[in-house]
Structure formats: structure tokens, C-alpha cells
Design a protein with these regions (language model features):
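Residues lining hydrophobic/aromatic ligand-binding pockets adjacent to catalytic sites
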Residues: 1-234, 245-246, 269, 287
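Basic helix-extension-helix modules of the SAP/HeH family
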Residues: 230-302
Length: 302
């Protein structure tokens, strides 16, 4: 079983529910919702719709997984999950919670009262991603039966327990500013399908700026075996659609920074990142999207 959704609602809830059966609630990381608010979320969602919950930052950032200090906060998160009928709780620690704190993490996961909830942990920072850090994670998480959460296109998890839980933040220089290509989504599917026989299967949660479109395309691919068009437009028309969404005047550098991460389909099955098309163009300030299109025709062979 492979389940696909987004981290938060990138579109209206009604539009989201029409397409997906899963969402990771992120607002719970910043604020404890009232019982009434949580009940409203559950009531508005379809009966079989599934929520996963990102645990409040009190647990991971303020109390840094110190179990006695974090226990009350964790109980509040569990209460939210009960209202939502959520089974999975995501703990995300900051980059300052380095690998030297592995014992605190293991003690937390070993002794916190989980009840029937499944805990997954997303680490941040380079100390968890080298050989030593990954081994420490693998050893500790196997003892406490907790899945390590990563973007598997960047880094494979150190340990996967009863569930594979992947969060896709993007592969670009700047976190979140990214759109996945068809080839990358195919690779993601090949990874996910290796874990779909797990007790809870594989959960794929997109958390990049193009999360809704990427999740939609990925779900379509799983169900149909091929990808839908990005926009229905190709070549210069597809480029025009993207570059018309920014303000002018704009320098080439600002265009690359703001929208260069987007994908353009030059023709069916042929994708290129917009930054690759803009890079050969002259360094200047563009007054309009039409001026960019004129230069593209002169400098780029489409």
C-alpha cells in the first residue's frame, strides 16, 4: 500500500479531499488546536480520510525530547490525534539536536506512553547523515521500533519499522523551492514500492512549493502507469505560463531565484528546468515576459 498526500493543505480543503485521502497536519507543530477545531477538521473530512499529525515543537524544540518535561505536551498531541482518528505522530527535531543527543532520543521513544500510536522521527542536520550518525540512528531506532523519516531521493532512512514515511522537501539549493521531474518521481515510486508490503505500507508526503501538483502527478502515475501533462501547454506557451506569474521589471538572476526551479515541458515527455533555459540569456533587466520570450527564441534552441 502506497499513500500519497501533502504536508498541510496547499489548496482549499474541499478541492484537496476530492483528490487525496491523506494529509499531514503541520499547524499542530506551531499551535495546539482546540478540541472544537480538531473536531471540525474531522467532521469536514470524508469518513475514510486519514490525518497524520506533526507533534508540537514544545516536544522537540523546547523540551528537546526530555521525557519528563515533554510528557504533558505529548499527551495534548495524543488527544488531538484521538479526535482526528490519526494513527501516526511525526516528531521533527531541529538541526541543533545533533547526533550527540541520541541517548535522549532513545530514552524518549523507549519510555513515552505511545498507547496505540505509531511514532516516526525526522532528524535535521548533517551529523545524522554521515556514516557514524546513520549507524547510531539505525541501532537506536531498531531498539525502539521507530521509523527514520527522510526524503529518500536525498538520503535513505537509517531504519524503517512498520511503516515507511517519506517527506519530500525538494532537491534544490533552497529548501522547498523545487518541482520534481517525471524521472525523479519514477525513482521515488521504485523506492516506495519496495516498502508497500509493510504492515502500514509507505506514506509519501510532499512538502515543496509545488507539493499539490507533484503529489497529484505522483498519484496519477501510481494509478495509471504514466504521467499527466504538467499544464497542457508545451514549448514557448508553457514557458509563457510560468514567466507571466512574476512581477516586472526583473533581472535574469531574480527570475532564476524566484521561478527557475519550475519544470517546463518542451514537448510530451521532454522536461527541462526553467533555470536551464534562462541561464544562457544575457544578464539584464527584463521589462516584460514578452521580452524574455524574444530572447529565448534568439538564444535557445527549443
Amino acid at each position: 500500500m502506497i499513500k500519497v498526500g501533502c504536508c498541510g493543505f496547499p489548496v482549499s480543503q474541499s478541492k484537496y479531499y476530492d483528490l487525496f485521502g491523506l494529509v499531514e497536519l503541520n499547524t499542530t507543530f506551531y499551535k495546539y488546536p482546540s478540541q472544537r477545531t480538531a473536531e471540525g477538521w474531522r467532521k469536514r473530512a470524508p469518513e475514510k480520510f486519514e490525518f497524520t499529525v506533526k507533534a508540537h515543537q514544545d516536544i522537540s524544540h523546547k523540551y528537546r525530547l526530555k521525557i519528563e518535561q515533554a510528557r504533558d505536551s505529548f499527551e495534548r498531541v495524543k488527544q488531538i490525534c484521538r479526535i482526528l482518528r490519526a494513527k501516526i505522530i511525526l516528531i521533527q527535531t531541529p538541526a541543533s539536536f545533533t547526533a550527540k543527543y541520541i541517548n535522549d532520543a532513545e530514552e524518549f521513544f523507549m519510555n513515552i506512553e505511545r498507547d496505540d500510536f505509531i511514532l516516526v522521527w525526522e532528524t535535521r542536520g548533517p551529523t545524522w547523515e554521515n556514516e557514524k550518525g546513520l549507524k547510531m540512528l539505525r541501532d537506536a531506532l531498531s531498539r525502539v521500533n521507530v521509523t527514520h523519516v527522510t526524503d529518500p531521493l536525498r538520503l535513505m532512512p537509517a531504519h524503517i519499522a512498520d511503516i515507511a514515511y517519506f517527506r519530500l522537501h525538494g532537491l534544490g539549493v533552497h529548501l522547498y523551492y523545487y518541482q520534481y521531474t517525471n524521472d525523479e518521481l519514477e525513482r521515488l515510486y521504485e523506492i516506495a514500492r519496495k516498502h508497500e508490503a509493510l504492515k502500514m505500507g509507505a506514506y509519501i508526503l510532499f512538502n515543496n512549493l509545488a507539493m499539490f501538483d507533484d503529489a497529484r502527478r505522483f498519484k496519477f502515475y501510481i494509478e495509471n502507469g504514466y504521467f499527466p501533462p504538467l499544464t497542457g501547454n508545451y514549448g514557448l506557451e508553457a514557458i509563457k505560463t510560468l514567466i507571466s506569474q512574476t512581477r516586472y521589471p526583473a533581472t535574469k538572476k531574480s527570475l532564476i531565484d524566484k521561478i527557475g526551479w519550475r519544470i517546463v515541458e518542451l514537448e510530451p515527455g521532454r522536461q527541462v528546468r526553467l533555470s536551464d533555459l534562462l541561464s544562457p540569456m544575457p544578464e539584464k533587466t527584463y521589462k516584460s515576459s514578452e521580452e524574455i520570450l524574444d530572447d529565448l527564441e534568439n538564444y535557445i534552441s527549443l
